[in-house]
């Protein structure tokens, strides 16, 4: 499987399966001599952990990254950084009755065809959201390196169904605002919508269903001039890694699809001078023009599909016997993956941005 990417000097390779012994990541190209706050890494990863309030899976994994190379006494050595996370709370028996039933919304069937029937189906195998744990470790390390270069990143839940948070101010969002939501139970700018979101998730769960949502990301402190045109633009790199997060189905930068309903005079961001720096008065371009940063905040949003594992009966097929079947999924699943996916989206984008700086 190609669960790896290489952009410039940075390469990241993720390994393991949801119900295997362990999962992990190898990161090459990180700058030697960089001090990493390991407690801060653990705090970052804890944001991805299941909540104990009915909004996420009951699977309980400690997700402690055992660093086996590339770091000594909290300092990066410059050689490949490898971290391994043990899987300790698998319930593989939940999947025996559905081994060859194509779960709607999952990659069981496509993986079976792609890998000639050899893919690990337990818990989704390598296609599982479980595999984002090592991605978030890598993203946590990247976040610290970015911050040491004056770049602050963050994300929040923009919406779950019809419950919507405020958007980041695309022109004036700042580092302090990005940091404020990081440790909130649900990462929201406007905490008053939290209960509405909880009610939507609880209702879906009670109805044996699930819901999706939208996550918004921002990065501030990037200078103008980072990126490349056409096929290696900063949007391209961000999108490629973001789509490695299971459940992501769409991405838009700046004003996104709204630009299709604008005149050029509305969409164009006029330039100005502020405190001796070139800026734009608006930021419909999301901080990127021609694949290159403009110096304005990078802003993008991603659409997360509802968790496909639901307990409602669904029609499917057994792809080994070629018969139609009825499927009722058992096990422990998130009625809404969006809250736990916020640090995953941050991690993906952080790594993409970091790839231009090393």
Each model region followed by its residue ranges:
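Generic N-terminal targeting/processing segments that precede catalytic cores or assembly contacts
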Residues: 1-358
């Amino acid at each position: 499987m190609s669960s790896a990417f290489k952009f410039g000097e940075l390469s990241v390779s993720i390994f393991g399966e949801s119900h295997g012994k362990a999962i992990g990541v190898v990161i090459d190209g990180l700058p030697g001599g960089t001090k990493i706050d390991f407690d801060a890494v653990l705090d970052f990863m804890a944001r991805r952990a299941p909540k104990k309030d009915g909004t996420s899976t009951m699977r309980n994994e400690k997700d402690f990254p055992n660093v086996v190379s590339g770091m000594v006494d909290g300092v990066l050595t410059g050689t490949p950084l490898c971290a391994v996370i043990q899987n300790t709370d698998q319930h593989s028996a939940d999947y025996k009755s559905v081994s060859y039933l194509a779960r709607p919304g999952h990659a069981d069937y496509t993986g079976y065809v792609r890998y000639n029937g050899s893919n690990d189906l337990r818990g989704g195998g390598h296609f599982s959201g479980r595999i984002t744990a090592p991605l978030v470790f890598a993203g946590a390390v990247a976040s610290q390196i970015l911050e040491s270069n004056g770049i602050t990143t963050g994300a929040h839940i923009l919406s779950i169904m019809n419950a919507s948070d405020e958007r980041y101010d695309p022109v004036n969002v700042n580092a302090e605002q990005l940091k404020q939501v990081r440790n909130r139970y649900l990462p929201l700018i406007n905490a008053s919508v939290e209960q509405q979101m909880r009610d939507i998730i609880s209702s879906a769960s009670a109805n044996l269903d699930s819901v999706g949502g939208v996550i918004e990301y921002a990065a501030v402190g990037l200078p103008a001039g980072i990126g490349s045109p056409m096929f290696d633009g900063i949007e391209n790199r961000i999108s490629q890694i973001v789509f490695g997060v299971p459940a992501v189905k769409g991405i838009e930068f700046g004003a996104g699809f709204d630009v299709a309903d604008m005149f050029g005079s509305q969409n164009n961001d006029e330039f100005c001078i502020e405190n001796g720096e070139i800026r734009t008065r608006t930021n419909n371009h999301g901080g990127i023009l021609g694949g290159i940063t403009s110096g304005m905040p990078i802003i993008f949003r991603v659409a997360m599909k509802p968790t496909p594992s639901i307990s409602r009966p669904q029609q499917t097929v057994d792809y080994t016997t070629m018969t139609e079947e009825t499927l009722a999924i058992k096990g422990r699943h998130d009625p809404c993956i969006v809250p736990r996916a916020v640090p995953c989206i941050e991690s993906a984008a952080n790594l993409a941005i970091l790839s231009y700086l090393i």
